[in-house]
Swiss-Prot record:
Residues 136-146, 168-177 have a biased composition (Polar residues). Disulfide bonds: none annotated. It comes from Rattus norvegicus. PANTHER family: OCIA DOMAIN-CONTAINING PROTEIN 1, OVARIAN CARCINOMA IMMUNOREACTIVE ANTIGEN. This is OCIA domain-containing protein 1. 'Asrij' stands for 'blood' in Sanskrit as this protein is strongly expressed in blood vessels. Belongs to the OCIAD1 family. The modification Phosphoserine is found at S108, S116, S193, S198. The gene is Ociad1.
Amino acid sequence: MNGRADFREPNAQVSRPIPDIGGGYIPTEEEWRLFAECHEECFWFRSVPLAATSMLITQGLISKGILSSHPKYGSIPKLIFACIVGYFAGKLSYVKTCQEKFKKLENSPLGEALRSGELRRSLPPGHYTQKPKYDSNVSGQSSFGTSPAADNIEKETLPRYEPIPFSASMNESTPTGITDHIAQGPDPNLEDSPKRKSVTYEELRNKNRESYGVTLSHKTDPSVRPMQERGPQKEVKVNKYGDTWDE
């Protein structure tokens, strides 16, 4: 026993197996007879009346000038088209009636398939898949009533973990390469160091003027001039032998 009791409601509906009707299904004799009856009734009571009615309506529209006739064949093409449309419309309109006849047929796999399909469509979704209430209640009670031996086995199989100290967990969780130092503020010595004085444009211009004046004074100073720029030299006489003498 697995500890669960499976109860079913007395009025619970069980899904009926749908007969397998595939392409190779061979109808029974009663089904063949009903097929012939449906075909005959559909032809005489639906297809022929609708085809004739559509042809008459088409001819009336052509005679009134609402529909134009063919220049060579007249109204024949439109009448043929109206007849075909009425014929197939009659066959489609008789499908529902023929299905109802097959549903009333006893010992018919085709009728059973039609009845089962209609029953499934009429029921809400999930009707057959819904579990009884007794099953869920009993399963809930059996889950609480487990044996003590099962509890002991579960406790033995569970892994045991030793408590970890808080300090050890903090040390293990700390990433390597990162020190727990407090961010320090700016160095006061750096703040006390004299700041570089900003130079304005006027000061730079005055400084350039002073340097230019010093350079200009050096150029105009006679002591700095080259020897060639000084006064004219004294004339010296030279004889034909290249000797010089002063007068």
